Amino acid sequence: MKPNYRIFSIVTAVSLVIDQATKILVDRTLELYQSIPVVPGLFSITYMRNKGAAFSFLSNFDYRRPFFIAVTLVAMAAIAITFRKLRDDQRLAAVSLSLIFSGAVGNLIDRVRLGEVIDFLDVYWKTHHWPAFNVADSAICVGVALLALDMIRDERRQSKDN
């Protein structure tokens, strides 16, 4: 197995297992909207359901479920195509795309199974709350940040070589 495919398999599997296990744990142990402070004034575990996308975007759109499923499948295909084009030395890009892919799959599982996504990570400062999110959302954000860093690093390396 090529190194990047090994990375993809491991990162995707680990991220997906953590995402689904935490969602199952929250769903089985908390009531909807129940909140458990972890770091008072900063972070709680709060069981929420999100019918939309980030920040509940399109949560009232009638065809949101098939729309989000279709968009996710297209994104997953684009990630897979991009991944296949990576060189063996592009390990950070491989990790990045794996995280983004696993996050997409994690939220897709929720949408197909429940028609909505389980969110539970609640970050806030006093009365100002960031929208609740989950491990899949975190994987996507970290993956995008790492991919941006990898692109900057590659650009600097190429300009240095020229």
UniProtKB/Swiss-Prot annotation:
Membrane-spanning intervals of the chain? 66-86, 92-112, 132-152
Give the enzyme's EC designation: 3.4.23.36
Q: Does the keyword Hydrolase apply?
A: yes
- Record key words, sorted: Aspartyl protease, Cell inner membrane, Cell membrane, Hydrolase, Membrane, Protease, Transmembrane, Transmembrane helix
Q: What InterPro entries has UniProt attached to this entry? A: Peptidase_A8
Q: Which reaction does it catalyse?
A: Release of signal peptides from bacterial membrane prolipoproteins. Hydrolyzes -Xaa-Yaa-Zaa-|-(S,diacylglyceryl)Cys-, in which Xaa is hydrophobic (preferably Leu), and Yaa (Ala or Ser) and Zaa (Gly or Ala) have small, neutral side chains
* GO CC annotations on file: plasma membrane
What is this protein's record name? Lipoprotein signal peptidase
Source species of the chain? Geobacter metallireducens (strain ATCC 53774 / DSM 7210 / GS-15)
Gene name, please?
lspA
